[in-house]
Amino acid sequence: MSVRTSSRSNKGQNKYIEYLLQEETEAPKKKRTKKKVDSATEKNKKSDSSQEPRKDTENVRTDEVDEADEGYVRCLCGANNENYDAAEYSHGDMVQCDGCDTWQHIKCMTDGKDTIDGLMSEDSKYYCELCDPSLYAHLETSKEAEVSEDEDYHDDVYKPVNDHDDNDADVFLDEESPRKRKRSPDSAKGIHIKSKQVKKSNGSKKRNKSIDAAKSDTAENEMPTRKDFESEKEHKLRYNAEKMFSTLFSKFIVPETIEAKLYELPDGKDVISISQEFAHNLEEELYKACLNIEFGTLDKIYTEKVRSLYSNLKDKKNLELKAHVVEGKLPLNKLVNMNASELANPDLQEFKEKRDKVILENFIVEVPDKPMYVKTHKGDELIEDIAEPQEDILYSKDSIRLHNIDSIDSDKSKIEQTHAISKEPSPSTIINEESLNCAFLYPGLGLEFTGYLNYIGVSQKLRRDIFKEAIGDGKLYVEGRLPTTTAAPYLKEISCSRAILVYQLFPSNDSESKTTFADVVDSLENKGRIAGIKPKTRYEKDFYIVPSKGGEIPEILKDILGSHNDERSERFSRMKSDERTLFAFVVVKQEFIH
């Protein structure tokens, strides 16, 4: 067994050297034998002279192997065989790797600790960050490997925009691509040096600095901080963003606006120089907009804004936006704060507006049909009260101009109003004792009129008669519209499981109500729509108003009532061929009727 000792005086000495030397001397030594040389013969003299250079060569090789066996210096702080001097380094003791025989400072490898107990393997051996990288997840390297442009382009952080068939090599940003550590020439050379097997004790091998160096050098150990790493990362991110914007201006924005005669280059400047100037200013404004002033860091939205600006300004259909940017009509500080919808080309904006308009037209507010519960000290209690909702200001009597007089006895009031109307009947309608006064409000068209409802029938038998109760206060407020082609199949299908009350709506005898009534019927009939009314009670699921012209009865009415309601036909008024009318359909949930 051989002992690794340093041939350099300025290196630290292993504290186990004496123990190992003592152990070495106790082992039996091999005797060396020398060959006797016959000086009498000339042949032996020539052989001796020829062997002398061979011995010198062997001695040189032995010295090189001994120096290689001792190991080499390679530490994270930058120390290596070329610049290491114990008097100049104050990083403390060093430790040697059992895999590649490299010497490293203990504090540098343990992030400032004086012991390496946490880095020792199960067999009490120490391995550096190259031999066993899994032990050094806590370290942050002080130097980052340089990444080439090709690697940045293929890091897949910003994917190329394939909206044109161009073959330009765009530059894309890299926000969180892994860093590659490049080994120094000394470190690469030392890994391939063969090491001798040495018997080690359970303790670690340390390399102590000299006493003179400990007294003279008092500088603090400088380690790379997280702030330095973030600054380097942010710098690279901004550099790639500016490079990407420069390509955008030089290959797309400036040439396309010049070709369309929307922009002219300033005197003394070419496309490259003006593109670099625009790119630098745009990146500066984007950095200011995405900088978190409180923490002094760059928000993650920075990379998203770079993608959005690049893809929208590269779009050939967005020529007007490009012209506004290069001409200065759109300031860069406003450009970086525009959202994706504002940056999109006119075709996309028009499509989005049409889509939103269609969604609003088909929107129907659904009334929740779940039972209401109240939390009390006894638990959850179901609310059985079906009281009418509080009157809204939109339903005030002044706005809808109701002509009925409220009374304490509501039944008596309705009877009196029915007799009053029956004295002056309309020549084309029949008013019976079951007619209910109502007011129709259509805020979407700004139309309103007063009238009355005649009850026609119900699709299923109910526990009790609710045809008056279902209308409530008679204020019919239009909440929305939906196509007739959608509503008719729905009413036909739901009539099998739900009860549907059917009414016929007539206007009052005054000319203003009749004119407004005709406008409502024409509007719904021409557009193929039915009106959705706000439900009046908690057991009502849907409330629809269906138009009819030319004296025709809607097919859906026949499908819902069926032949068993033929006796209800006498309730219909005799309509002329040119008469307009409205039918009300109230979908009821029977389980909530008590």
Swiss-Prot record:
Record key words, sorted: Metal-binding, Nucleus, Phosphoprotein, Repressor, Transcription, Transcription regulation, Zinc, Zinc-finger
Biased composition (Basic residues): 191-208
GO molecular function per UniProt: RNA polymerase II transcription regulatory region sequence-specific DNA binding; zinc ion binding
Principal subcellular localization: nucleus
Location of the region described as Disordered in the Swiss-Prot/TrEMBL record: 1-65, 142-231
A biological-process GO annotation: DNA-templated transcription
Lineage: superkingdom: Eukaryota
In-chain residues carrying the UniProt-annotated modification Phosphoserine: 177
Localization annotation: Nucleus
Matching SMART domains: PHD, TFS2M
Biased composition regions of type Basic and acidic residues, renumbered to the chain: 36-63, 155-164, 209-231
Compositionally biased intervals (Polar residues): 1-13
Domain TFIIS central positions: 254-365
Bias type Acidic residues, positions: 165-175
Zinc finger feature spans (PHD-type): 72-134
Positions of transmembrane segments: none
GO cellular component: nucleus
Pfam families: PHD (PF00628), SPOC (PF07744), TFIIS_M (PF07500)
PANTHER family from the UniProt entry: IP08861P-RELATED, TRANSCRIPTION FACTOR S-II ZINC FINGER DOMAIN-CONTAINING PROTEIN
Homology family: Belongs to the BYE1 family.
Domain topic, free-text comment: The PHD domain is involved in the binding to H3K4me3.
Function: Negative regulator of transcription elongation.
Quaternary structure, from the entry: Interacts with the RNA polymerase RPB1 subunit and specifically with the trimethylated H3 histone H3K4me3.
Protein's recorded name: Transcription factor BYE1
Lineage, highest ranks first: Eukaryota, Fungi, Dikarya, Ascomycota, Saccharomycotina
